[in-house]
Structures are given as structure tokens and as C-alpha cells.
Amino acid sequence: MIIGNGGIAKSFESSKLDHKLLCIIAAGHSDSTVNDAHSFRREVNMIKRVHKNHTNSKTIYFSTTSKYLSATQTAYIKHKISMETLIASCSTRYTIINLPNVICSLNKNNQLIPWLYHSLQSGKQIDINPEARRYIVSSDEIPLCVEKIANKDYKQVALMPQTALKMYELIEIMEKITSKKFNVNYSNFTEYYQKIFEPKQYDFVYEVNGSRKNIERILTKLIRTYE
């Protein structure tokens, strides 16, 4: 069973994954800027309801690698950690899959890639630390990760690229694809997302290709389809 209708949930539509014995919760918050107690409570209630109605299924929940990579514990990160605790208290049959920045769609929201794309299209000035790093994966990798770990007893899994891209590289990639220039102010302001990924913090790491060439390929396909 798949719960949700967003980008992550839709990534399972073309997947061959047999999820009849799984309860894949893909309906949580993906906007790391959110700080809404009401919507946080709604997710708590949803998870409790799911566990009550699907006691025989293994739960797959998507959290964030930012809980270890971020130097600042935002409301969003604290909420994700509390959701992990809730799931662990409801069942012993679960896996938390921690995600970095996910390329799902270009629909307007506060996620990194859509924010960059629409800032580029509008000419809005953005402030960027060029040396800041971002770990980026495609949503197409998520069903493959779930298939890999579905029958394992891992509690904490990370879906991570082998390398991180610097922000100036992302800027260059999107400018190349669109033949447009960002209105960007490069500055060395303090970045809250500077820590290096540590595999030992997880039971299993599902590694994907995060090279500049591969991210350019994924973004080219996404942008061409959107436009």
C-alpha cells in the first residue's frame, strides 16, 4: 500500500515493486521550511491511523538526512525525528529511509530544485554560498531502494549519492540547460548544511550516482518535459 499522491508516491507508479505487504508512507512533509504545528499534528494523526489499520504490514517512512547534516535543528527536522520515534513506538516492523534533496518535479514549492528553476525563470535575485554542498538524488531511485531493503531488518537507511554538488555547480548546470543566467549574489554567509555525510550513522546506505554529469542528465530530462 502506498499512502500519498506527491512526487515520491508517484515514483512508485511505474515501479515493479510488489508492495502488497508494505505500508509506504509518502504523504509527509517534504518542505524543510515548514513550521506549522497544525500540519505537523495532522501527520501524527495520519501515522497513528495507518498503524491502527495496517498492523500486518511493514512500514516504510521517509525522513531526512538533514538531521545529521544540518548544524541547526529546525522545526522541520525536529518534527521528522519525532515521527521516527512515533513509528518505532507503534511497530517493530519498519524502516526509516532518510533522503537528501530529491528531484521530483518543478512544481512551485520551497524545495531546492523547483526554487532554483523558478528563480531562474523569473529573474529573482537569490543569495548563494557557492561552496555550499547539496546531496541530490532522483525520485526514480526511491522505489529501487525500497525494493533492496524491503525484506531486511534495517531500521535506519540512507539513500545517498556518492558525492555532493556545490551550489555553483547546480547554478552552472541549470544555466546550461535553459540558456539563461541566474540573478545570483554569491556570498560566503554561514551555511547550515555543511557537514559531511557519515555512513556509520545508518544501518545501510543505498548509494546512487550523484555525479555532475548524471544530475545534469536528470535535470535536462525534467526541465525539457516541464517546458
Residue ranges and their predicted role:
Residues 14-56, 64-72:
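NAD(P)H-binding glycine-rich loop region in Rossmannoid oxidoreductase-like domains
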Residues 1-5, 125-127, 157-160:
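Short hydrophobic beta-strand segments
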